[in-house]
Amino acid sequence: MQIIRDTSAINPEPSVATIGFFDGVHAGHRYLIQQVKEIAAAKGLRSALVTFPVHPRKVMNTNYRPELLTTPEEKISLLADIGVDYCLMLDFTPEVSRLTAREFMTQLLKERYQVKYLVIGYDHRFGHNRSEGFEDYVRYGKEIGIEVIRAKAYTSNIEIENVPNVPVSSSLIRKLLHQGEVDLAADCLKYEYFLDGIVVGGYQVGRKIGFPTANLSVDDPDKLIPADGVYAVWVTFDKKTYMGMLNIGVRPTIDNGPNRTIEVNILPVSYTHLT
């Protein structure tokens, strides 16, 4: 996958594209992207995703905390594994936010990114205030030379609270993680939810009582942390993977007041390399 941030330096070839923030790169995203790839192969064109390095709402409101399922780096890595040709990274600026859907399609999709076919997710909207819909995009596409295609809706086999075939969305996955439903979240994501960070110094009280723990500082402060609780986890450290136990919440080994922490206990290996 080629990541293109500056089209003045690299001119993308004509493509079949879709647009989205793709937080989590979940099952619904993957189904949409697979359709893009299939149409691109049939048309003899490149496949492309137009996405944003920063959540659009955070650009407009710096106090907004998006609770990301994937950091920008994690998202790019997951998208690369899917195998699209281009990841077109668009900086969402106040100027971009003011573009109507027609202006966005003309100035960015057609003139900058050379998009020939635009595949729209079943509930996706774009343009100023997201006030226009699929039929508008089709009409604008005919006027400027982009064929707009409605993607097939993704039907899950996931049942939640006795409701079958629940539509998968990033919002649903956030809700599940806030409830501690990590298994259901994994079903929606098609991979186990993960946290990435560095080990930071602690009080080492756990070591004294026979349960040495590593204190984790998550790399991105906007990354969503699941509900407080104890979880069985896989821990990757120094290119090796171990079974572990993760505690999220107030430290059980020491009075840490109201501060929320993440502690992992790796078993059954030596802990000396974590200090």
For each feature predicted by the language model, list its residue ranges.
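Classical nucleotidyltransferase
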Residues: 98-212
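Aromatic/hydrophobic pocket-lining residues that form π-stacking "cages" and hydrophobic walls in ligand
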Residues: 36, 137, 272
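Short acidic-hydrophobic, aromatic-tinged amphipathic segments that line or gate anion-handling sites
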Residues: 2-8
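General small-molecule cofactor/ligand-binding pocket signal
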Residues: 4, 87-89, 147-151
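Residue-level signal for inorganic ion chemistry
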Residues: 26, 79, 118, 185, ...
